[in-house]
Curated annotation (Swiss-Prot):
Keywords attached to this entry: Aminoacyl-tRNA synthetase, ATP-binding, Cytoplasm, Ligase, Magnesium, Metal-binding, Nucleotide-binding, Protein biosynthesis, RNA-binding, tRNA-binding
Originating species: Thermotoga maritima (strain ATCC 43589 / DSM 3109 / JCM 10099 / NBRC 100826 / MSB8)
Reaction equation(s) it catalyzes: tRNA(Phe) + L-phenylalanine + ATP = L-phenylalanyl-tRNA(Phe) + AMP + diphosphate + H(+)
NCBIfam families: pheT_bact
HAMAP family xref list: Phe_tRNA_synth_beta1 (MF_00283)
Signal peptide: none
Domain B5: 399-472
Positions bound to Mg(2+): D450, D456, E459, E460
Entry-linked PROSITE patterns: B5, FDX_ACB, TRBD
Name the UniProt record assigns to this protein: Phenylalanine--tRNA ligase beta subunit
Domain FDX-ACB span(s) in chain numbering: 694-787
Length: 788
């Protein structure tokens, strides 16, 4: 999220400079990654008027202009022959620097000296490409410094907004944080709109209330679609959005300012003069504003006029009903869409927009009228026209603020310090707080969907109060013996680890289908048949937990839950030498998105995702393992491995065979591992000693190799660890690519190597030397070559 400083200060009046603002935000949990200057312009760049224009005496491609700045007249040469007398332009004078780094100085063009330069928007950093001198649409005061007047000296906070804080995807949201931190009041918008009473044939209907709990529309007439003024262009570009026209720019401006995406339709392109919100059935095709046609999967929220699709709700508008130069009448949409439905639709169609980015995380369902008024006010200011008084607002089931009780004693117990007036901190964040004696009754505003429990409120108090103010104390915790044995404690430790890695624990039946075990024998074990099975597909004891987990995964798929991380610690059973045996194993299965809670992260689970979970477990337990490629029935041949400790197999890992997945109607790549808990506990008896935080920085190097498909990258990893010596701290794979630019039957594998010296800082020269030797050794030993 890019937040221009001047825009932020309109909402909260602060004495802090921008560096202090960045520091306070970061300390409170809103991380400022950088302070940017989006425009690389400086010096005397001023408004001027062309008072005379004539052809260059020695060049047909140039013209000579006399330009008045209010103080003196300059001679300027330009190649833009559309410049005319009377045009108000932007003049860069000697010493000025343009966005492309060009420094202005007097220059001779075939016998005529140009004393400056007439600027295009590209040269000011306001457009990516422009070959025309910018002309102000209306007269302006001469001699005004454009850099200062229009914010081309703007500084911008580049803020990393976590997925749980959609309220901060707006200027007002960040300003609210600063208001709470500083104690200064938040200046909320107070839209001033002139209304006209006029009857109009129009209606709004919601058929899909689940996908669209609230939809509002407002009508404007008589607008003029044209280029946006310079101040609007500059502010949008500073915020990372390109300018299109005054109406579209107004919608983007309001979205950035208030955090609620909005849309404008051309009223006269609505066939039935009505809005009907419905759910897609699947198979429909729609042409969107990105000029691409999409076939809908079913379940998407559609904005229609009863017959034609106008927009993909919460994601993108349609081409047919968009705003064009001849648009005169508008329908202004401000709605609330279900975050889950928007996320699923955007993912299924492969669309990512500023609108879906916000709706996926959750916008405020109860700021709709304010946002609509602000949009109407801004369009009226930029495009003229008038606003109809009637406001269509369909909101069948109002979403009420959550009520949470907060115990005062609990605040001090959790934070470890007494906070004066914690209720006031919450009020500054716009929570409604009632003092109930020994507790607070708190109404959580609907723009804060992340706050659900008492502990969330305490976190809000702590971060605004300042964790740096909390005195550090040594905590003494007495040992408690719960009577658990070593085995139970180890089992609990592994369970807690898997939950901490984002996996959900399941408990399943030990009875499975003998036909599945026979067809896909992941392990070479003889199953134990049941003499009296409870069902025909539960007639043997499982030889692997795989058969249980795949069933759970398939059931979730039927219910549209496709981002899954499952694990189970349980028994497997088999015959060995005529005897019945049972072994406790840890098994895990994962598919779908790698981080389903992070809507900015579209990566899917891969082999290295689930292997990374195992690697972290082995590291924590101090177990040194070796992965060896293996063909395992039921797993994909080139993406499976057995796991060994001291040449003894303790488990296996791999990608589930797509043919097997088809039998369960699972359409996502799925990964599985199974580890013998008894052997894991045995080899985990020696835990790693405590290692202090490194005093010296690490140095990372990456390398991409072209490898034959099926090549075991673990061989390179082991070679790097061995040849790099004690300076190599970590080696791993972080990217695999095959496709365009990669030869057939080859794959590009990118590895990273982390170097660190315990006693000093490594130089680039010595790291480069060691790294190059390692790479060359890998090339020689394995007959491979680097990609870059």
């Amino acid at each position: 999220m890019r937040v221009p400083e001047s825009w932020l200060r309109e909402f909260v009046d602060l004495d802090w400079d921008i560096e202090q603002i960045a520091e306070r935000l970061t300390f409170s949990g809103t991380s400022v990654e950088d302070i940017l200057r989006p425009f690389n312009v400086s010096g005397e760049i001023i408004t001027a008027r062309v008072i005379e224009r004539f052809d260059h005496p020695a060049s047909e491609k140039l013209i000579v202009c006399k330009v008045d700045t209010g103080k003196r007249i300059y001679t300027v040469i330009t190649a833009d022959k559309t410049v005319n007398e009377g045009d108000y332009v932007i003049l860069a004078l000697e010493g000025a620097t343009l966005n492309n780094g060009l420094k202005i100085e007097p220059r001779e063009f075939k016998g005529v000296i140009s004393e400056g330069m007439l600027c295009s928007l590209e040269e000011l950093g306001l457009e990516e490409k422009s070959d025309r001198v910018y002309r102000f649409p209306d007269p302006v005061e001469l001699g005004v410094n454009v850099v200062e007047e229009y914010g081309l000296n703007e500084r911008v906070l580049d803020i990393e907004i976590t997925p749980n804080r959609p309220d901060c995807l707006s200027i007002i949201g960040v300003a609210r944080e600063l208001s709470a931190l500083s104690g200064r009041p938040l200046n909320k918008p107070q839209p001033d709109v002139s209304f006209v009473d006029e009857d109009v044939q129009f209606d709004v209907e919601i058929e899909d209330v689940e996908g669209c709990p609230r939809y509002s529309a407002r009508i404007m007439k008589g607008v003029t679609v044209k280029d946006s003024p310079l101040w609007m262009k500059a502010r949008l570009v500073a915020a990372g959005v390109r300018s299109l026209n005054n109406v579209v720019d107004a919608t983007n401006y309001v979205m950035i300012e208030l955090g609620h995406p909005v849309h404008a339709f051309d009223l006269n392109r609505l066939k039935n003069k009505r809005i009907v919100v419905k759910s897609a059935k699947g198979g429909e095709r729609v042409l969107l504003l990105d000029e691409k046609e999409y076939e809908l999967k079913g379940g998407e929220v559609l904005i229609t006029d009863g017959e034609n699709v106008l927009a993909l709700g919460g994601i993108m508008g349609g081409m047919e009903s968009g705003v064009y130069d001849d648009t005169r009448d508008l329908v202004l949409e401000v709605a609330y869409f279900d975050p889950v439905r928007i996320r699923k639709a955007a993912k299924a169609l492969g669309i990512s927009s500023e609108s879906s980015y916000r709706f996926e995380r959750g916008v405020d369902p109860n700021d709709v009228e304010l946002v609509s008024l602000r949009l109407a006010e801004l369009i009226q200011k930029l495009a003229g026209g008038y606003v109809l008084r009637k406001f269509w607002d369909v909101y069948p089931r109002k979403i009420e603020p959550k009520k949470v009780m907060l115990r005062k004693a609990r605040i001090e117990k959790i934070l470890g310090t007494k906070v004066e007036e914690p209720g006031d901190i919450l009020r500054r964040l716009e929570f409604q707080v009632e003092d109930r004696g020994d507790s607070y009754e708190v109404l959580v505003p609907t723009f804060r969907p992340d706050v659900e429990r008492e502990i969330d409120l305490i976190e809000e108090i702590g971060r605004i109060y300042g964790y740096e103010k909390v005195e550090s104390k040594v905590i003494s915790v007495p040992a408690v013996n719960r009577g658990w044995g070593e085995k139970q404690l180890f089992r609990r430790e592994i369970s807690q680890f898997m939950k901490g890695m984002g996996f959900d624990e399941v408990v399943t039946f030990s009875f499975v289908d003998s036909q599945k075990v026979k067809k896909w024998p992941l392990v070479d074990r003889e199953p134990i048949a049941l003499s009296n099975p409870i069902a025909s597909d539960m007639d043997v004891m499982r030889t692997s937990q795989f058969y249980s987990l795949i069933q759970v995964l398939a059931e979730n798929f039927k219910r549209q839950n496709r981002d899954l991380k499952l694990f189970e610690i349980g028994k497997i059973y088999f015959k060995e030498n005529g005897n019945f045996r049972e072994i406790e194993t840890l098994s895990a299965m994962s598919c779908g998105l790698e981080n389903p809670g992070d809507y900015t992260d579209k990566r899917s689970v891969s082999f290295y995702t689930i292997k990374g979970v195992l690697d972290e477990l082995f590291f924590r337990l101090g177990v040194n393992v070796v992965y060896r490629a293996a063909e395992i029935p039921g797993l994909f041949p080139t993406r499976s491995a057995r796991i060994y400790v001291e040449n003894r197999e303790i488990g296996f890992i791999g990608m589930v065979d797509p043919k097997l997945l088809d039998e369960y109607d699972v359409k996502e790549d799925t990964y599985f591992f199974e580890i013998d808990m008894e052997l894991l506990r045995k080899y985990a008896s020696k835990r790693p000693a405590y290692r202090p935080t490194p005093r010296f920085p690490a140095v990372r190097r990456d390398i991409s190799f072209l490898l034959p498909k099926g090549f075991e990258s673990v061989k390179i990893i082991e070679l790097f660890k061995k040849s790099g010596g004690d300076l190599v701290e970590e080696v791993g794979v972080f990217d695999i690519y095959e496709g365009k630019g990669i030869p057939e039957n080859m794959v590009s594998v990118t590895l990273y190597v982390v170097f660190r010296h315990p006693e000093r800082t490594l130089t680039d020269e010595e790291v480069n030397k060691i790294f190059e030797e390692m790479v060359q050794k890998a090339e020689r030993e394995f007959g491979i070559r680097r990609r870059f």
